[in-house]
């Protein structure tokens, strides 16, 4: 089965067990792209802030899949799913359970005595009401109905995070804080304001995301100076598209492809030793394998890294299928996944 690891990494024993903070801004494109292509935005103030705090910014980093659900399910399972080889039905699979119910990352954390907390802006990931694998979540199922699509209730993730942080200092903590800024251009053609207006809106929301991230990071460093902090986008902002569903029309345009798949990764390691031993991290699917092997000081787990490839669904009538859009080394690659 696709979820099974090729080694015993679920039994890995971490030598270093800092509190781990995963902050995920939706649709945050990588610093290496934001000055270029369709974005053309100077984000140096925030980039310099992270550098001054000691973060490593991983240039060229990208997601392996095009959406929040498809990307995060691969992130937390630490494996490729290839949209389950079903391009027409990919949106129907229950990716949510791989994010918040049961996954490899949660198993490893719990095996190392971590308490786990999920703090999110709205119930989008909770919408299918899966069982919770996290010890706590900031939104109650009583707050929304079974037919929830998008919107209310909206929680202030900063306030909820401040309430939750450091409640039990006796055991290591993992916090996954997810918020939907800067987000991406409109999903549908009918909702689009046109690519230029969509870009302007994305930049406005980027500024809000930067402010929130600064507040989150500053709060952590004040309360927990030995923290491990990860800023990890789920996918790109799709700036340059009129609407996100255009990604399912085949394109060879490098800047459009990277606008969808490029995403930010910045890590503040809890010690200079761990910072110096930080590996090169290229894509979402391998983030936690790299993280855990560094905390365990055990390089044997590099033998089963997943391919750093980005995969897309194409729904063009004549070319329908699942395509590798970006190859191992960042090259544009239009190889079609064999039908299975």
Please give the residue ranges for each predicted region:
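Metal-dependent active-site segment of extracytoplasmic phospho-/sulfohydrolases and closely related
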Residues: 209-249
């Amino acid at each position: 089965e696709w979820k099974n690891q090729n080694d015993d990494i679920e039994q890995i024993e971490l030598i270093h067990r800092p509190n781990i903070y995963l902050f995920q801004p939706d649709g945050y494109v990588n610093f290496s792209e934001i000055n270029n292509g369709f974005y053309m935005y100077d984000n140096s103030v925030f980039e310099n802030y992270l550098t001054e705090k000691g973060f490593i910014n991983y240039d060229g980093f990208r997601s392996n899949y095009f959406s929040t659900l498809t990307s995060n399910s691969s992130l937390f399972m630490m494996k490729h799913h290839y949209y389950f080889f079903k391009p027409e039905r990919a949106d129907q699979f229950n990716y949510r359970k791989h994010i918040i119910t049961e996954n490899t990352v949660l198993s490893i954390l719990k095996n190392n005595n971590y308490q786990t907390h999920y703090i999110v802006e709205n119930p989008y990931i909770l919408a299918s009401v899966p069982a919770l694998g996290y010890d706590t979540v900031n939104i109650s199922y009583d707050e929304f109905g079974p037919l929830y699509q998008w919107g209310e209730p909206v929680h202030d993730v900063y306030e909820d995070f401040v309430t939750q942080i450091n409640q039990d200092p006796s055991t290591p903590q993992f916090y996954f804080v997810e918020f939907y800024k800067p987000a991406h251009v409109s999903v549908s053609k009918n909702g689009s304001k046109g690519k230029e207006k969509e870009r302007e809106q994305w930049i406005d929301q980027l500024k809000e995301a930067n402010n929130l991230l600064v507040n989150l990071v500053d709060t952590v460093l004040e309360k927990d100076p030995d923290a491990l902090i990860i800023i990890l986008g789920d996918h790109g902002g799709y700036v340059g598209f009129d609407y996100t569903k255009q990604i399912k029309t085949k394109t060879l345009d490098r800047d459009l492809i990277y606008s969808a798949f490029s995403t930010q990764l910045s890590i503040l390691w809890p010690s200079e030793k761990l910072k110096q031993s930080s590996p090169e991290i290229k894509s979402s699917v391998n983030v936690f394998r790299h993280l855990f092997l560094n905390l365990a000081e055990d390089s044997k787990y590099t033998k089963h890294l997943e391919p750093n490839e980005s995969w897309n669904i194409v729904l063009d009538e004549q070319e329908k299928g699942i395509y590798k859009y970006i190859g191992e080394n960042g090259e544009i690659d239009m190889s079609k996944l064999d039908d299975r």
